[in-house]
Amino acid sequence: MTIEWWQIALLTIYAGFSFYDGNNTTFGTVKPTMAGFFAGLILGDIQTGLIVGGTLNLLVLGVGNFGGASIPDYMTGALLGTAFAIESGKGAEFGVTLAIPIGLLMIQLDVLARFSNTYFQHRAEAYVEKGQFDKAGLMNLLGLIPQSLSRMLPVFLALVFGSVFVQGVVDYMPVWLM
């Protein structure tokens, strides 16, 4: 199966929205099971999506990012693992095998996204000191843009260039980075 451009677009948008959702509306789209289901729905194999997402959801149980700690992003792992499992026809086991290192790799991008978010937070603090609370709220929302992009860009690149690209990135990464 070849992943079509519209499927890449929907999965990329989902990756960005789910991060926003996890910090604001909390519809649950940030959960790996939901991400796997959505990817399976878009790509035509819901069962594989649920198996990949559900397996990754077991890894997330009891894990929280308290105090700003970065945790593996198994939502992105579920999206990409499901997509590659369906695309390759190798099954859910293959998808989970790819999804776990993808989730671990996303920790590093999460750190970069949080770092870039500090610009908006410093502006928000300045607006609060001036009593401009509406602008401070806007800065908090704008701070989600780099964080959403930290999910959207890897999903887009991985889906455009394929699982060989992702496996190559994971294989050439130093162990300390994971």
Where do the PLM segments sit?
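Juxtamembrane/transmembrane-helix boundary motifs in multi-pass membrane proteins
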Residues: 2-3, 24, 28, 44, ...
